[in-house]
Design a protein with these regions (language model features):
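General beta-strand structural signal in soluble alpha/beta enzymes
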Residues: 9-10, 35, 98-101, 124
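A short acidic, often aromatic-flanked loop/helix-cap motif at beta-alpha or helix-coil junctions
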Residues: 15-17, 103-108, 128-130
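Thiamine diphosphate
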Residues: 1-67
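Long, charge-dense
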Residues: 67-75
Length: 153
């Protein structure tokens, strides 16, 4: 399988990945930065969306996997099924925001995002449920941070 050498796994810190990704996008302007958030994490730190949109990094894609639950911490429901994250992203000032609910549209949006020269928000509606063999990180948070920082330099 694919390793996580280039990933910064923010396990246990729901909502901070978009802020971290913004900082990286601002310092690595020649690299495409992909931030994958969950709906629960996005909702926990929704103010980050306003900050992201105000900075408009043209090399960043913000993807929110919306299964309407805090799945990794027990599956408690979120309110993401009752609100419109795309409208919120647009209201915050994202230049492009879209919601997809099938693989064909997701593939199309990811290909377009790869080539785009502007901040993009992609909400992916998905079902609740994760792989039975989905593991946890095998490194400590400190090791993960250090490896990621080495990769950035």
């Amino acid at each position: 399988g694919q390793g996580h050498e280039c990933d910064f796994l923010t396990v246990g810190s729901m909502g901070h990945s978009s802020s971290i990704a913004l900082g990286i996008a601002m310092s690595k302007k020649n690299e495409k930065i992909w931030c994958v958030d969950g709906d629960g994490a996005c909702l926990m730190h929704m103010g980050s969306m306003a900050v992201l949109a105000s900075r408009k990094p043209d090399n960043m894609v913000h993807i929110v996997l919306n299964n309407t639950a805090h799945e990794t911490v027990g599956g408690m429901p979120t309110v993401a099924g009752n609100i419109d994250l795309v409208t919120i992203a647009e209201g915050c000032g994202y230049p492009y925001a879209v919601c997809v609910d099938n693989f064909a549209d997701l593939d199309k949006e990811l290909k377009a995002a790869k080539e785009a020269k502007s901040l993009r928000f992609i909400e992916v509606k998905c079902a609740l449920g994760s792989r039975a063999d989905l593991g946890r990180p095998t490194t400590t948070a400190i090791e993960n941070k250090e490896r990621f920082m080495e990769r950035l330099n």
